[in-house]
Amino acid sequence: MATGNSKGLLVPSFVSDDEYQLLKKSLPEDIKIGKIDGPISALGNCISCNDSIALIHPEFSKENEDIIENVLGVEVFKTTIAQNALVGTYSKFNNKGGIVHPATTLEEYEELANLMQIQIGAATVNRGSEILGSGVLVNDWTIYCGYESTSAEIDNFEKIFVVSQ
């Protein structure tokens, strides 16, 4: 699984050379692409980022941490969300806001809000699922969410992410 932001795209090391070249040709020239080596390959579950900050799984190597920082052009922080290492599964961010697992502690909220300088809120998707990564895709212009998401969940996303009209 791949993940990225407006500056770069990260793919797991098992992506073939042909796939890598196809991705590289498909992206604008100013977008970097990088391969992450090692046992962590579900990158969307293990990295949550916007254009300034990347929260990453605590077990990423220093070498991979440097690749993430360089390719995405962000500051990198090893952390957990609601005491879970799968930060990309339990949080989603754009450049204006972020949603996190409902069990996130007040300390974690404050730390994230101070670190990222954006509003942070608790959320669920698809009628109460806490697995945000399985049902939310967001950038600064639009939000996609699972078809079972309730109007209250969608309203919450719209308020937190402040997507452009």
Map each language-model feature to its residues.
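The feature marks the mature, well-folded catalytic cores of soluble enzymes
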Residues: M1-Q165
